Amino acid sequence: MLNVVIVGASGYAGAELVNYMHRHRFANIKKIFVSKNSLNIDKLFSDVHQQFKNIVDLRFDTIRNCTLIKKNIDAVFLATDHRVSHSLVPFFLSSNCIVFDLSASYRMNNKKVYLDYYGFVHEYEELLKNSVYGLAEWEQEKIKKANLIALPGCYATCIQLVLKPLIKENVLCDKNIPIINAISGVSGAGRKASLNNSFCEVSLQPYNIFTHRHTPEIIEKLGVPVIFIPHLGPFSRGIIATITCKLKPNVKSIDIHNIFNKFYKNKPLIRIYKKYLPSIKSVEKQPFCDIGFVIKDDYIVIVAAEDNLLKGAAAQAVQCFNVRFGFSETESII
């Protein structure tokens, strides 16, 4: 039985992590932590997330007390702000914990991105070089040996799962940039209240065009330029991405289906649609990424959907945990 700690368990993704790990047959949640200024310190998890009453009744502790138990911990999940994870990762690694970081703090190799997009100077360049990117379907062999797994962003997960097979098989026209329109539910902005996320203000609207934080992550990991247009949708959870690309001549629907089947046939959390297109309804509160596509002439439109809190965050983190420790990939997830 592995002892785990979850930091940031009061947030949406953190709560989903607690849910998954609570029912994990080979893990024991030792502690759940919140920030030192959190109003939830000493509250029960089920008082903050009432859907878990009589299911998970652990008590929140302040992160200040994490030093007291670090010697008895096998794995740590960080569902925290980027700057918080930036500081906590070296601490937990020095305590011989395997770290699963859901923030962006160790995702990218380019140190300058953190100043340009996240507003802080990254102080741990060596850890950046040694971190393993936790796109579970693509990095399993590296994840098995990693001490620091940096989980992808929610948009970045969905988009890469679509485009990586097509780029690897060289079926996209080199002269045309993939254009990505993606809509996320409001939970993607976190649990903290703000005017833009309030019930009366939320709408369907684009935001951070060309400047979204996931843009450099997507480009770095795909190795090709993209145009990424994120939108905020008037719903609580889920992401749907519509990606338009130009194909090389004579690429047919059967070719694309065979490509996706080649890479994802034995990947239980990827579902390929042959006749239909995905919807948010199909993935809400589910750990899957669903992919479908339509081709006309030399153009392909691929639609992908995921729950941003699950496959885009908590489910993928637990998937990486399972891979790292040699459990079934879907243990506690499905």
Curated annotation (Swiss-Prot):
Cellular component, GO, one term: cytoplasm
InterPro entries according to UniProt: AGPR_type-1, NAD(P)-bd_dom_sf, NAGSA_dehydrogenase, Semialdehyde_DH_NAD-bd
UniProt catalytic activity: N-acetyl-L-glutamate 5-semialdehyde + phosphate + NADP(+) = N-acetyl-L-glutamyl 5-phosphate + NADPH + H(+)
Keyword Transmembrane helix on entry: no
Active-site residues from the entry: 154
Key word Transmembrane present: no
Main location: cytoplasm
A Pfam cross-reference name: Semialdhyde_dhC_1
EC number(s) per entry: 1.2.1.38
Protein's cellular compartments: Cytoplasm
One of the GO BP terms on file: L-arginine biosynthetic process
Residues spanning the signal sequence: none
Keywords carried by this UniProt record: Amino-acid biosynthesis, Arginine biosynthesis, Cytoplasm, NADP, Oxidoreductase
Protein task: Catalyzes the NADPH-dependent reduction of N-acetyl-5-glutamyl phosphate to yield N-acetyl-L-glutamate 5-semialdehyde.
Family designation: Belongs to the NAGSA dehydrogenase family. Type 1 subfamily.
Name this polypeptide is given: N-acetyl-gamma-glutamyl-phosphate reductase
Species lineage: Bacteria, Pseudomonadati, Pseudomonadota, Gammaproteobacteria, Enterobacterales
Gene encoding the protein: argC
